[in-house]
Amino acid sequence: MTTTLNADPAELAKFSELAHRWWDLDSEFRPLHQINPLRLDWIDKLSPISGLRALDVGCGGGILADSMARKGAHVVGIDLSTKALKVAQLHALEAQTPNVAYREVSAEALAAEAPGAFDVVTCMEMLEHVPDPASVVQACATLVKPDEWMFFSTINRSAKAFLYAIVDAEYLLKMLPQGTHEYAKMIRPSELAAYCRRAGLDLQQTRGLEYNPLTQRYSLSADTGVNYMFAAQRPA
């Protein structure tokens, strides 16, 4: 596990600059709001979260953390963007979201502090933004209790992902700001699977997320060519 802070200052600055727009449904974060019901339902079916202690790694403005808390989980969201965390905290206060707290701490630091403290760990749309994604996966594996679940989502490093996630989403459809994603930082499913194996995790399920520009809707799919999610368990 890395000993230096596993963060890219440019990435932190980029998302901090947009922090005030996290809960604007017509902003650059609209895609996250659109996919959130799909990923929340998928998580809840594999690991019913009501009453569980959940950790959301790279929580940003709290979109997933807030929705898990509203499903009955006791949630801690962590991030390294001070501005994003302030937005998440303010939203929780205004929306009166129960049982959610936010901390400015890295996954690695929290893993050293509280190993095996959580019933479920999520790390969504974050791995492609850090210098050492394998270190984050290892930290997640340390943080979750034995026999419990972790959920990851990221973007494939493929020609299709370059076309859809960068050219289309950032330049043609302008769904995201230019420079949101860097092709070299995207992660192939085989690479994420290798990170999971090295962390001692058992991969249980893979799902793709597909976007239909005509209906402007996302759906779960077997196609992992662009956005995809992994469900893994820490062995008992």
Q: What residues fall within each predicted segment?
A:
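Acceptor-substrate binding/catalytic loop of class I
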Residues: 174-191
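Conserved SAM-binding strand-loop segment of SAM-dependent methyltransferases
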Residues: 95-109
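A short glycine-rich, Lys/Arg-flanked "PGG" loop and its adjoining helix->strand segment in the class I
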Residues: 134-149
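A short acidic, Gly/Pro-enriched loop at the edge of an enzyme's catalytic core
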Residues: 111-120
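Conserved alpha-helix/loop element of class I SAM-dependent methyltransferases that forms part
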Residues: 33-52
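N-terminal, positively charged/glycine-rich alpha-helical extensions of SAM-dependent methyltransferases
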Residues: 1-24
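Conserved SAM/SAH-binding beta-strand->alpha-helix loop
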Residues: 81-83
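Conserved class I S-adenosyl-L-methionine
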Residues: 149-173
